[in-house]
Amino acid sequence: MGNAPQRPILITGGGRRIGLALAHHFLTLRQPVIVSYRNEYPSIEGLRQAGATCIQADFSTDEGILRFAETVKSNTRGLRAIIHNASAWQAEKPGTPLSETLACMMQIHVHAPYLLNHALEELLRGHGHAAGDIIHFTDYVVERGSDKHIAYAASKAALDNMTRSFARKLAPEVKVNAIAPSLILFNEEDDAEYRQKALNKSLMKIVPGEKEVIDLIDYLLTSCYVTGRSFGVDGGRPLN
């Protein structure tokens, strides 16, 4: 058993922002990583050079999701964790059919984690008590809704609910939790006015950066007891 290879952590949407930071964090710890990505970024080549297994995937169809799952299975016989980071933020807007917006949000935030959790369940099980993890990235809007991103908020709320359902299904071998962030990082194109307005929405008045999320994930992965819970990383924003 001591010579058994480490099981990789699977991170969906690992080519940018939090997913990318997580991948590099684990690689620094000599933890094997598999990342999914849709578009080729320079960061993907950097991950490859650092030792990550990078798999291009299209989650816009169920077939693409299941094809990705089969590729993962061909690369490893076990998984330490699945971190569902892949996301899209699409608002209702004139010219785009509402049904299309809803379908897109449900596809990436509900179909993908639902199908992957089922398809890869066997890779997470069989390694002992609380030896596997699934982490869903939801959003603080699950609590309050959103008048401009209704489909997005609804899809993240569905993912939040699935956290508890999968926790019931997979315990005690696999823990399943959710992280509900608000503003973690600015985009480069965000101007000063937008940044100040965004900062004022939280009680803590800062942008914490990826480390706040990384530290929480490290805690969840090392816990032997916490499952079926959602953790807000929002600076008290729902209270403001």
Curated annotation (Swiss-Prot):
It catalyses: (6S)-5,6,7,8-tetrahydrofolate + NADP(+) = 7,8-dihydrofolate + NADPH + H(+); 7,8-dihydromonapterin + NADPH + H(+) = 5,6,7,8-tetrahydromonapterin + NADP(+). GO terms for molecular function: dihydrofolate reductase activity. Signal peptide: none annotated. It is an enzyme of class 1 (oxidoreductase). It comes from the Bacteria. GO terms for biological process: one-carbon metabolic process. Keywords: NADP, One-carbon metabolism, Oxidoreductase. The active site is at residue 152. Its EC number is 1.5.1.50, 1.5.1.3. InterPro entries: NAD(P)-bd_dom_sf, Sc_DH/Rdtase_CS, SDR_fam. Pfam families: adh_short_C2. Belongs to the short-chain dehydrogenases/reductases (SDR) family. FolM subfamily. Catalyzes the reduction of dihydromonapterin to tetrahydromonapterin. Also has lower activity with dihydrofolate. This is Dihydromonapterin reductase. It comes from Enterobacter sp. (strain 638). The gene is folM.
